[in-house]
Amino acid sequence: MDRRKFVKTTLAASIAASLPILTACGEKAKVATEATASIRGISLDGVELELEAAAIRELGDALSGPVLLSGDPGYDGARMIWNGMHDKRPALIAQCLSSEDVAQAVNFARERSLLTAIRGGGHSWPGKSVCDDGLMIDLSQMHNVEVDTAAKRAYAGGGALLGNLDDATLAHGLATTAGVVSHTGCGGFTLGGGFGRLNRKYGLTIDNLLGAEIITADGKIRKISAEEEPDLFWAIRGGGGNFGVVTQFDYQLHDFDRNILSGMIVWPIEQAREVLEFYAEWSPGLSRELYAGPMMATMPDGTSVIGIEVVYNGDPVQGEKELVPLRAIGKPIDDGIKMQDYKVMQTQEDAALAHGVRSYAKNAMVGEFTQGLVDDMIDAFIADPRAAIFTHTCGGAVADHGETDTAFPHRNAQTMLVFFTGWADPADDAIGKKMCRDWHAALDSHSGGYYDNIEQEGDTGTAGNFGPNYDRLRSIKTQYDPGNLFRMNSNIEPA
């Protein structure tokens, strides 16, 4: 069984067939907002407020893209985000086509202290890219990616998806670290840090971020980099969406052969101890070219399995040599590691994490893959087709940076554990959340913090998670967003 088949026969098979695949709205012509009456809104502090019809019309006239109200054509499609569990209704949606549009929308929200959510790819697991009764600033039409092959740089719009980035760069024999689900937005993914199958060789996505364009709470359009407003540039590399709306990301690219040694080896769950104990001993010595991470899941027929996903970003002959010990472990159901198009790997999770899935996740940054962690992973395993645990392998180039070099502090983690549940029926919401929380709680003693893109209620406080970077982040937040307009995130409150 190869990796694609494995994924599609586990979580995806039980849920994807019954779910609508929601896609971003197509290009829209300019639509004048015809607000004829005031509408209800909600302030940053949760107080009901009135949004006057004239002000809404003025915003609509100022934007090159449409402003959508409840009942308008396109409103329901625009408000829906990836995670089907979050069904919220903004008072209005500003569908921006330019940085100037974003600045107008930010000014509108700030002047009214209006609750504001930023939708890039709409892939926020906890649903923070949409809000009830506030303003959604929708960047989904700003999805263009341009590649400068001579400079080996990519310029991605704030609404670009990781699939857009991969498509644009791979076409030129170039790549950078991107995530594992192609319909994830570049925006939230990058601002949180950015884990992917190439991070051991190239570092996190933020380590490949050379610059950005951001609209801060004062409505100013800023170009930032290590040379221009370096404190703000430092903060967005791991500090999330706390500091403004990023409308362009400038990425460093690397020469890359998309025909790559990759895939998964799968064993019966009964061999989990042998596999995980081997991995715990083997993984600290991996070369930077080798990304290898375990996962555990149950298929719809009740068969539980453990797998290790592999991507070797280098000479495949050397890669085969490095994989010899892995292939000697146990009696696998299937060895699906082979030469294949990297895009196959980058899209194989898309079905299991399809648009409309009702989903919940928690995560843990783990400093060392210990025997105790192995024991707890086995003891806590939930044999349910709606649940799975994935890992993202760190080390290598991720650890080349110190914990204060960027806002993302977890540089010494060996692994990130991601606990995921997905289901179709709203009646399963409670059990879906409980399974995920219980699994996470059983392994939480091994955690050194969390990846804030997957933050959920009840997670360790933001101050503790950012550790030595928190005070600096709070100072920068106070400078650029003193009113905490951008709070729909893993929030850092201004001083």
Task: Indicate where each model-derived feature is located.
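Soluble FAD-dependent oxygen oxidases
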Residues: 2-495
